[in-house]
Amino acid sequence: MWILIYLFIIWSSLRTWVTAVDSTTTVGDDLNETVSASVWPTMSPQMTVAFRSQRDVMGNLTIDQLPYVGLNLRRVLLNNETSMVNEGNNTRLLTLFKSMLSSEANAFVLDLEQYNNDLRVVDTTLLFSDVLIALESFIFSTQNNLYANIIVLLLNISAPELDSTEYRHQNQTLNTTYILDKNLGNSFIYKPTDLQSDRAKNNTWNIYGKSSIDGWPTLGSVLYEQKKRLVIGELTDFFNETTAPYIFPHDVFHYEQGNSTLDCPSTVEGLTDLSSIHWRFLDSLFNSVDIKEYISCGLSPIISNSAYVNNVTQLADIIHEGSVWSWDSDQPSVTQSTSKSGSSSGTLEAYNCVLLYYFANNETVTWRVGNCYNSNIGLCRYENMAFRWLVRSNKATYFDFDSYQGSKCPDQYSFNIPRSPLEQRSFIAYMRNSSFSDTQIWIDLNSISVSNCWVSGGPYASCPYEKVISRRNFVTMMVPASVCSFALLCIVVYLSVLRVPIYDNRKNWRRVINKISKSELEGVPS
């Protein structure tokens, strides 16, 4: 019985160890997973980590200020030149749409027309409900902290050719709420009523990080607290609050086609003015060069490059250039473990911290992984001011720049990071005005706690995806317990195999007892 008990203890210890080892590599293992269909090029492990780290960095930005990269589905996928559309190949169209959802694109413009008291995708036989079912499938498969992201669906509704009376009647009888509830469900949709509720609870913010009655909630609040994934908006004026309570009206979005009327800001005042405009979209033709410039100017590009179905995946390069505005082309380096090691020169190495490289000749910046033990200057931000920066001249390791003893940043400043293309543009303006040469600067981003999980919050920030026990701490914790368990097991085995001598010689012991018993007096003493 005792053997079984202690074997169970050992088995439990080993099982816990295996679980902990698996948990420390979960993020790395997830790099090999994919939720993409085979039609669209899948993201590499490096690209997956880069895209996820950007999302996490932007967690405290409001959803209206995020940089979205979108596709105009009618131009890119559902145009009349696509043979699948002419053939009515809806299955393949939906397969390609699902694979687009799994790419870096996170905004889509969809043209719909009213058809028999329903909505149908223009120039196809696809119903709006078919698209919603595909969306629901994708959202369910990515409803976790690793893959979840906000999707914006912008609708262009074509009015039927009817007189005004018939038009009003059909508009009122078209039940969009029923269509959305039946084929997608309202739990994933961030609705106008949700925005009203957030504003009533002071859960909406402006660019200064202060509660605002005309602001929007943060990405982290929408994704992780409210578990919302989809924002639906209308670009036309077909619906109203009564007929489509789940859909935001057209005046919420700043949507332009062709050329933008918004100037690209170069001053803090210009950046602040631009940030006061919500949901800035530009629907136009883009290439892999100019899309980065539009992103850095605070616009969310909607790609309208006409494509054939056989070459539609060539747009993946353009989407990639627009969606990754931070990391260098070969970054971040994907590792299998986080460890501290010594080089041949005897110095410590831990390539788990991020340096922002500034190039003065062309005024560009990029992020690269660096050795946390190297000494560099660091980046500080003034309180909650999104566009006010300070670079400290005193060098320190990543661990020393922002530690428990205090930060190297002065009072009212904190160790920080550009969280969006606009903030990065304001940093470039600061570096230009301060006449900095080419410089490497620590920013608040590292993967010290878990490999490939890049987090902000200093060197002691934990990975948000799960509760993880590091290998180093786990070994320190489990070695004493394992040694004690093994020692107890050895004692039990020893006592079970080697009997105590008194039991090993029972006959002699019984003879001695009988001899002593005979010498005892019997009866009652007189």
From Swiss-Prot:
Using the UniProt record, give the first listed, main subcellular location.
membrane
Write down the glycosylated positions. 32, 60, 80, 89, 156, 171, 175, 202, 240, 259, 311, 362, 433
> Pfam families attached here?
TIM-barrel_MTC6 (PF25506)
Task: Please provide the record's keywords in A-Z order.
Answer: Glycoprotein, Membrane, Signal, Transmembrane, Transmembrane helix
Membrane topology, as annotated: Single-pass type I membrane protein
Topological domain spans for side Extracellular: 21-477
Q: Which GO terms describe its cellular component?
A: membrane
Q: Which residues lie on this side of the membrane: Cytoplasmic?
A: 499-526
- Tell me the compartments it is located in: Membrane
TM regions (residue ranges) = 478-498
Q: Key word Transmembrane helix present in the record?
A: yes
State the function annotated in the UniProt record.
May be involved in telomere capping.
The similarity annotation says: Belongs to the MTC6 family.
Entry protein name: Maintenance of telomere capping protein 6
What species is given as this protein's source?
Saccharomyces cerevisiae (strain AWRI1631)
